[in-house]
Amino acid sequence: MLLWLYHSLIMSDQNTASFYIRNIPIFGRFILAPMDGYTDSPMRKVCKNFGSSLSISEFLNGIDVTRGHPHFKTQSYFDESERPFIYQIYDDQPARFLAAALKLAEHQPDIIDINLGCSAKNVSNRGAGAGLLRNPAKIAEIAGSLVQNLPIPVTAKIRLGWDEQTENYLDIAHLLEDCGISLITVHARTRKQAFTGQARWSAITEVKQAVRIPVIGNGDVVSYADGIRMLDETGCDGVMIGRAAIGNPWIFSGSDRKDIDNGELLAVITSQLNLMVDLYGPGIAVPVFRKHLVRYLQGLLNTSEIRRNIFSIANPHNLLQEISELIDQRQPQ
């Protein structure tokens, strides 16, 4: 009953904003989380078609943005259909962080997001991402500088703290709000937990009750029903879905992937692969798409022979033919 009621409320009036990021209306409460190596423009477009209300770049290294990087063009690419669009940046140096944000602002995104949540050791151990949670003064310097110098809203994504002994999420939330940040996303785990253990949704509730700006919840949402439950239990303004959306854009619309018919499954796979070919060229698109394909074809790549055959195909057209034949064997449940 609760799932049906929330879905009806969410879908009833597409002309009414669910919440605002400063002056930007957001239509919908389910959002694709930024994931390094996954949430490129093709994946964002596919998920937006199914209901993701915001498009967020893969996290961008401030060093790469300011100095240049061979993959920067494709990593930073977005088009008008993805709006509202956010660039997410990580860095440990305030001056370079601002320089990167100003450079990215030239591409006319709608919002810039400060990554204070990445738990990867190569990021957090250098003091960037979740590593910044150990240095509130530097967070204030970065957030204040971006808010003062950018003409667009600035948001931030945080974790609960570096570890269970140094949780400071409420202090960081207040600090960010005081700096003029327009929205906070809370991944309800510590940096030490990374993606292990259970996300503590009660912390999302605490942040929502502590600040006046919108709060997005993140962590352990693996189904549409989980997202509805997070909204209900925490009072957050929106729900961010990450790993559960890989190969499953239907999670944003409330449909169960196992109920999707074969024709629609093939059409969505084809759409994402074609978008990737347009962005990267076939030589890069096909191998990069394989990690998505494994999730789309969950339960169908049952033998090493099937996997070897699928993963040996380099031509996009031939790959889609093989995928079509494989999907024909699938029985929607």
Show the residue positions of the predicted features.
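Alpha/beta catalytic cores of nucleotide-metabolism and tRNA/nucleoside-modifying enzymes
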Residues: 9-22, 26, 36, 41-42, ...
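Glycine-rich, positively charged N-terminal anion/phosphate-binding segment
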Residues: 12-20, 35-110
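Conserved, mostly hydrophobic/aromatic
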Residues: 32, 47, 58, 87, ...
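Active-site beta-loop-alpha junctions enriched in small/polar residues
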Residues: 35-37, 60-62, 90-92, 117-119, ...
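Non-cysteine beta-strand/loop elements that form the S-adenosyl-L-methionine
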Residues: 57, 111-119, 179-188, 240-245
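Active-site-adjacent beta->alpha loops and helix N-cap segments on the catalytic face
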Residues: 65-72, 121-145, 192-205
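Active-site beta->alpha loop and helix N-cap motifs at the rims of alpha/beta catalytic domains
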Residues: 83-152, 159-166
